[in-house]
């Protein structure tokens, strides 16, 4: 199969990359009625599969799970999750032929096999759904022309999709219809109803495209969302220990620091995050962020270029074909880092403000990383709304996974695709930061507060203006207006 994006001409590529419209709430007045009375079968019962299914069932839809015969016979985790939650479970042959909508929520690397096994069993005129378009865009999967192909992609891990729904809210969601597969013109109605059933319409829905979702999603997860947090965790921990800090304190400052810092980011963007610092620390964080951009911007652009060209996906799929040799090797190497093996911080107390005061360079990494990822996406034709959701918006959710069980938890929760891209980025970014940024750090940049200093009002004013007028802040202020009931996320120890 050929990479679908690479088969498009330039005009088509730009059109697909630029598909992005924030949908009005009244467009969801019918809720999920379009899917009521229809048989919906979910393939896969992992985090997204289970939690989307729970939400859809609670919204009044008919949900069942199709699993491989061996998964049922051996009572594997997917079978146990589905049955313990009271869902009907059957084999592909038992459930797929009567389904009106089949939703594929298996890992990316399984999609081609799932399509080969499932689509021939689907009835004429039915629909097939994804929550990530990698199989369509990067692998070039071609689905039977009588089948409608749609995507509903919540911009959160599956656990948060469920928790926000239970609160009566939801998570921001991208929806799309594959232009090659909408024979009856019902694709958008299906995607809207699916998004409503998961609660997405309560938090905001972007009408997007398979292409825009995939290219922006890959860029965000490889760079700021996972790669930058991994590289930053490793170099900051090593620096603290080298400076004589208690390893347990250093571990806690890093492990819970990302989460605490990005909670402010979630509520008020980079502006609020920077406002949590003293004036002297804010100036220093701004200066460090500009230096980080000098050091890493070329790497961000390379990742964006490799994603657009298909180089990243072809490299990763070659590793799939080789039994994930590189993925497993890199996962093992991550488990051996000093940060991952640092002592637990039992009894050590760090106040919320101390995470900011003693983590100025971490704040700088977040600021620089978000802005570089956002700018690279927009420069490649991705609209600002999509770039915001795939950079700033998801960052607190990923930081929360590190707070739970460090980098191990982050890499378990994210997809294998995200994990592979994370390693590609962090393996290059970590030595750059260690060799260029860390030697530049001064007293007060990490592990202790920034010393008081005389402040130049004009310089501070200009820095504040630069922070508040970056495009990610301008679009972020607008989009956060649709998410007026965001809960605080905290695993703080």
From Swiss-Prot:
The gene is ilvC. Mg(2+) 2 binds at residues 217, 390, 394. Pathway: Amino-acid biosynthesis; L-isoleucine biosynthesis; L-isoleucine from 2-oxobutanoate: step 2/4; Amino-acid biosynthesis; L-valine biosynthesis; L-valine from pyruvate: step 2/4. Keywords: Amino-acid biosynthesis, Branched-chain amino acid biosynthesis, Magnesium, Metal-binding, NADP, Oxidoreductase, Repeat. Coiled coil: none annotated. PANTHER family: KETOL-ACID REDUCTOISOMERASE, MITOCHONDRIAL. Substrate binds at residue 415. GO terms for biological process: isoleucine biosynthetic process; L-valine biosynthetic process. Belongs to the ketol-acid reductoisomerase family. This is Ketol-acid reductoisomerase (NADP(+)). The lineage of its organism: Bacteria, Pseudomonadati, Pseudomonadota, Gammaproteobacteria, Pasteurellales. GO terms for molecular function: ketol-acid reductoisomerase activity; magnesium ion binding. It is an enzyme of class 1 (oxidoreductase). Residues 14-208 form the KARI N-terminal Rossmann domain. Its cofactor is Mg(2+). It catalyses: (2R)-2,3-dihydroxy-3-methylbutanoate + NADP(+) = (2S)-2-acetolactate + NADPH + H(+); (2R,3R)-2,3-dihydroxy-3-methylpentanoate + NADP(+) = (S)-2-ethyl-2-hydroxy-3-oxobutanoate + NADPH + H(+). It holds the Pfam family KARI_N. The keyword Manganese does not apply. The active site is at 132. Gene3D superfamilies: N-(1-d-carboxylethyl)-l-norvaline Dehydrogenase, domain 2, NAD(P)-binding Rossmann-like Domain. NADP(+) binds at residues 45-48, 68, 76, 78, 108-110, 158. Involved in the biosynthesis of branched-chain amino acids (BCAA). Catalyzes an alkyl-migration followed by a ketol-acid reduction of (S)-2-acetolactate (S2AL) to yield (R)-2,3-dihydroxy-isovalerate. In the isomerase reaction, S2AL is rearranged via a Mg-dependent methyl migration to produce 3-hydroxy-3-methyl-2-ketobutyrate (HMKB). In the reductase reaction, this 2-ketoacid undergoes a metal-dependent reduction by NADPH to yield (R)-2,3-dihydroxy-isovalerate. Binds 2 magnesium ions per subunit. InterPro entries: 6-PGluconate_DH-like_C_sf, 6PGD_dom2, KARI, KARI_C, KARI_N, NAD(P)-bd_dom_sf. One of its GO terms (cellular component) is cytosol. Its EC number is 1.1.1.86. Mg(2+) 1 binds at residues 217, 221.
